A protein has these predicted regions:
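PLP-dependent aminotransferase class I/II
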Residues: 1-3, 10, 26, 62-256
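A conserved catalytic-core signature of glycosyltransferases
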Residues: 44, 52-54, 106, 115-116
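Adenylate-forming
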Residues: 50-55, 121
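Hydrophobic "anchor" residues on beta-strands that sit immediately upstream
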Residues: 13-14
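Conserved active-site segment immediately N-terminal to the catalytic lysine
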Residues: 17-51, 66, 100-103
Length: 256
């Protein structure tokens, strides 16, 4: 983030931080999501906090907060920032609030969260320390079990000054003799769900708009061909993790 923020400061630009998969982790001593004007987090079903679908944005800028509240609610007048903002209002102020509730001051969207979705998400946030600790335990167990295959696999590790949220457990094939698709099919056949990494340059709409960008972004192109995810989440038991490790042992067999 440091180089990005330096560019933004020089050119007087706003920054939006894509923190989609990085809840509750730190970078250079600060929480991910606290560096920019706005940070975006996902609460999709597979993510660290899930409400089933959707996500959230955070900011410490009061003016942006008012705008964001309006945009998520069809562009309504942001007379309410919190649901109890009218508790101490005078009668004249209440009249103004009532008249403004259905006043639309900009084009907006229907991005509101239901109370049930919010309750599910808040319960997970309250339990975040336990849940994140278990993710880290699961990741450590996977790393210890898969390290013997490091001639074939690149295992995940946090960069200096950063932490890893382990929404998934990413792996990359570094042995030319091993085909990613072959390994993925082997794992899937044994009940281990996988997912390919999805660099933007590999998406059909980006290829349609910009053509083949592989030569300009060789790392993304390499990941597109060689990397994949396996699961790493708080509900995985040690037995589940050991089963995953055992399948890798069976696949690599005498290759190590």
């Amino acid at each position: 983030m440091t180089p990005i923020l330096e560019i933004a400061q020089r050119r007087n630009l706003r920054t939006i931080e894509d923190s989609c998969e990085a809840m509750f982790v730190n970078y250079e001593g600060r929480p991910v999501g606290s560096f920019s004007d706005v940070a975006c987090f996902s609460t999709y079903i597979a993510h660290i906090v899930t409400t089933g679908v959707g996500g959230l944005c955070t900011t410490n800028d009061p003016e942006l907060l008012v705008c964001m509240k309006s945009l998520m609610n069809h562009g309504r007048d942001s007379i309410y920032i919190r649901c109890d903002d009218d508790q101490q209002a005078k009668e004249s102020e209440l009249f103004q609030i009532a008249n403004s509730r259905f006043s639309f001051i900009r084009f907006g969207h229907s991005f509101r969260c239901t109370e049930m979705e919010a309750a599910i998400g808040l319960a997970q946030i309250e339990d975040r320390q336990t849940r994140m600790a278990r993710r880290q335990e699961a990741a450590n167990r996977l790393t210890n079990g898969l390290t013997p295959f490091s001639n074939h696999l690149q295992l995940p590790r946090a960069r200096q000054g950063g932490e890893h949220g382990f929404m998934f457990y990413p792996l990359a094939i570094i042995d030319p003799a091993v085909q990613r698709n072959d390994l993925v099919l082997f794992l899937e056949a044994r009940g281990i769900e996988t997912r390919y990494l999805l660099p933007l340059i590999s998406q059909p709409i980006y290829r349609k708009l910009f053509g083949n960008l592989d030569a300009q972004y060789p790392v993304a192109a390499w990941l597109n061909e060689n990397a994949f995810y396996i699961g790493c989440h708080p509900e995985m038991s040690d037995d589940d993790i050991d089963y995953v490790i055992e399948q890798f042992k069976q696949y690599f067999g005498g290759r190590t």
